[in-house]
């Protein structure tokens, strides 16, 4: 491979390491120079360093693209090329926003923000998405003006070379930002990668319009500008929605839930886990709370010591703060266990996605109360009252008609 050739190098699993120019992987090489422990992607310090590095590279490349396209647009008289140049200038501004966002998100908690500043990264992603939308509207507006007053485009080999080089650079920026966004689980970098992809499509369409004008004389500059603007609006709207969802609050990934359950249930003293809630205050600022079912007859001091150990294990392995509530359950009363099994069967008969916990059996002189919680997903066709009434009726129909249900409905947060 020649020294000046640009090529994309893919690792296993489709992960992109970088683009080689003259035998150097830019991002990987720079990371090896400036980022200590660069493969520890869960470290807040490493995340911040990657964000600053990515932002700095983005600023430099986008300024170079702006200068090249501005020259090409001025020479050719193409409104689409000139608009695309200023799009790259706004991208440089977006890279500055991303850089500042990572810088702020890495700050330590303070009295005014005890949970840290991790969500500043989400806010920077939000601002990048808004910048994408603004650029889309401006491009459509300028393209409408071009439709009203079309002008011939002066094409040249220099213009085409600049546009092709711009496409290659933006493809590179898309891949390295997407790769980092996956490794760091970064909304800001994902927004930047989508922005780079939209720029790639935009510049490709501009190149096509330029070539069509050169060889056919058709003035499609304005139409292609509108098409590019609509695509930019779509991508900007998509990333805006995703970032807003993160700020409002999303359910955690199922893989994360499974990891938590695996760690907690890996301790023999824990018989079950429920009421699991994940509080996300930004990347690296995750807190979880859950209820762990333990034997009611167990030694409370030993159980408490084990619960402390589990909390530390979650902190060490998943980098999250954990608070665990101990729920005592009966494990050696045959009558209680048999009744619990019957009620669980009813709950699963109503809907297999439902689960039951905190089951207690309180006997009185004339009646027996069955007290328990039913955990249901957010998406269910039943209302809380329908679930409670159906279960109460089935339980009251049990032999003897002396059983009465006291039911609490819990909704999953994942």
Segments from the language model and where they lie:
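Alpha-helical transmembrane segments and adjacent TM-loop junctions that form the membrane-embedded core
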Residues: 22-57, 76, 80-86, 90-414
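Short, contiguous, helix-prone interaction/anchoring segments in small proteins
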Residues: 52-74
């Amino acid at each position: 491979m020649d020294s000046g050739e640009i090529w994309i190098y893919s690792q296993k699993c489709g992960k992109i390491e970088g683009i080689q120019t003259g035998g150097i992987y830019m991002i990987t090489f720079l990371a090896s120079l400036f980022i200590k422990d660069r493969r520890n992607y869960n470290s807040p310090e490493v995340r911040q360093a990657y964000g600053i590095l990515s932002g700095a590279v983005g600023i430099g490349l986008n300024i170079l693209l702006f200068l090249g396209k501005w020259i090409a647009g001025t020479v050719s008289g193409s409104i689409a090329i000139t608009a695309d140049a200023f799009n790259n200038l706004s991208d440089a501004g977006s890279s500055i926003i991303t850089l500042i966002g990572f810088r702020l998100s890495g700050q330590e908690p303070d009295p005014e923000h005890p949970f840290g500043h991790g969500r500043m990264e989400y806010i920077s992603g939000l601002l990048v998405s808004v910048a994408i939308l603004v650029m889309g509207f401006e491009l459509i507006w300028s393209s409408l003006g071009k439709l009203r007053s079309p002008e011939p485009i002066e094409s040249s080999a220099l213009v085409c070379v600049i546009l092709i080089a711009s496409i290659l650079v933006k493809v590179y920026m898309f891949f390295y930002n997407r790769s980092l966004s996956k490794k760091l689980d970064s909304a800001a970098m994902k927004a930047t990668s989508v922005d780079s992809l939209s720029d790639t499509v935009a510049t490709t369409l501009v190149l096509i319009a330029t070539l069509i004008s050169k060889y056919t004389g058709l003035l499609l500059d304005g139409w292609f500008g509108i098409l590019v603007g609509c695509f930019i609006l779509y991508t900007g709207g998509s990333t805006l929605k995703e970032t807003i969802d993160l700020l409002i609050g999303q359910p955690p990934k199922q893989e994360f839930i499974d990891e938590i359950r695996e760690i907690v249930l890996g301790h023999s003293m824990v018989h079950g886990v429920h009421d699991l809630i994940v509080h996300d205050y930004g990347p690296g600022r995750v807190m979880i709370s859950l209820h762990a079912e333990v034997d009611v007859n167990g030694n409370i001091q030993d159980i408490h010591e084990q619960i402390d150990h589990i909390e530390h294990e979650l902190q060490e392995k998943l980098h999250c703060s954990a608070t665990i509530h101990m729920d005592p359950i009966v494990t050696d009363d045959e009558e209680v266990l048999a009744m619990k099994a019957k009620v669980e069967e009813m709950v699963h008969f109503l809907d297999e996605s439902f689960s039951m916990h905190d089951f207690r059996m309180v006997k009185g002189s004339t009646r027996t109360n069955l007290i328990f919680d039913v955990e249901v997903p957010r998406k269910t066709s039943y209302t809380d009252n329908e679930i409670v009434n159906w279960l109460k009726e089935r339980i009251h129909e049990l032999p003897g008609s002396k059983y009465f249900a006291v039911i609490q409905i819990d909704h999953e947060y994942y």
